[in-house]
A protein has these predicted regions:
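Internal mixed-charge
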Residues: 1-20, 73-75, 79-115, 154-286
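Extended beta-strand solenoid/passenger and fiber regions
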Residues: 4-72, 76-79, 89-92, 98, ...
Length: 286
């Protein structure tokens, strides 16, 4: 499913489908900016009219969907209630959900991953000790590595059978020592890959359905965390009690869902594949 489909499901579960609003203002032939009464504003949910004529975004106006500020290129003419905007106000915009989904992928990167195999990107280089693996997308860790001992060979030889190799995750480099004595021999890398982050809500959600529950709990936690902060600002603005602590219940809900996210992840996350152990021959690592 697309990320937008997943977001719409989250909206239903979190009761954030949005509230229809309509704001009207008086044009005066000089004012360019008109603030919406409620925000943030859901993407593609708004219509702006001046004197009953629908205006075109970018050409006639711009809208900051986070702050609700409507800005015209040219000031609307004078009139009573002749400027209007119909829109849907939400707690989270689609882009907010997209950002948090990507944060969840980072949060669970060592709990949930994909196994992947690369057989075309790398070849051996004579006397080269390190191989930069940054061209492999979303790589987390190298589990095993092979190469073909001769051009045209159909047999993959495990690299650790003849030489030592080690992967350094922070540098994203594979170190081989001693290096290969020949160049241009195909290499095969078996690695763990993280889920692909979305750059637009139209992208396909890369998280498998069987692993979605802890990700949803994480998103719930972030949702209520922000809601708690909003409640603090709203209630704090109207109270001066020195011992006032705003919205503890909302923040407790956020903490509860974060705990549920961790517990669910620990229950259903896959086991890491076994890592190769160095072979010993006559007391020497090979």
């Amino acid at each position: 499913m697309t990320i937008l489909t997943f977001i719409n499901k989250l909206r239903c579960e979190l009761r954030d489908n949005g509230t229809l609003r309509k704001d009207v203002w008086d044009g005066d032939n000089s004012t360019l900016n008109f603030p919406a009464s409620t925000f943030p504003i859901l993407e593609n949910s708004y219509t702006v009219k001046v004197g009953g004529v629908t205006k075109t975004e970018t050409t006639d106006y711009s809208l900051d969907k986070d702050t609700g500020l409507l800005s015209f290129v040219s000031a609307p003419v004078s009139g009573s209630d002749n400027v209007e905007m119909s829109y849907k106000a939400v707690k989270f915009r689609d882009n907010d959900f997209l950002e948090i989904i990507n944060d969840a992928i980072d949060y669970f990167m060592w709990k949930f991953w994909k196994e992947a195999l690369d057989t075309t990107t790398f070849t051996t280089v004579k006397n080269q000790y390190e191989y930069d693996l940054s061209s492999i997308s979303n790589i987390l860790y190298v589990v095993n590595a092979w190469y073909k001992t001769a051009t045209g060979s159909t047999t993959w030889q495990a690299i650790q059978g003849l030489t030592n190799w080690k992967y350094y995750p922070q540098q994203n480099k594979l170190y081989v020592n001693p290096p290969f004595s020949s160049s241009s021999l195909p290499m095969k890398i078996f690695y763990l890959a993280g889920f692909t982050k979305g750059t637009a809500t139209s992208d396909t959600l890369d998280i498998p359905t069987k692993y979605l529950l802890p990700f949803k709990y994480y998103i719930y936690a972030r949702f209520f965390e922000r809601l708690g902060i909003e409640r603090m600002n709203e209630i704090g603005a109207i109270t001066t009690h020195p011992y006032f602590m705003a919205s503890p219940n909302v923040l407790n809900v956020a903490e509860m869902y974060m705990r549920k996210a961790d517990l669910a992840a620990n229950k259903i996350c896959p086991k890491l594949p076994p890592m190769m152990i160095k072979q010993m021959s006559e007391g020497i690592n090979i």
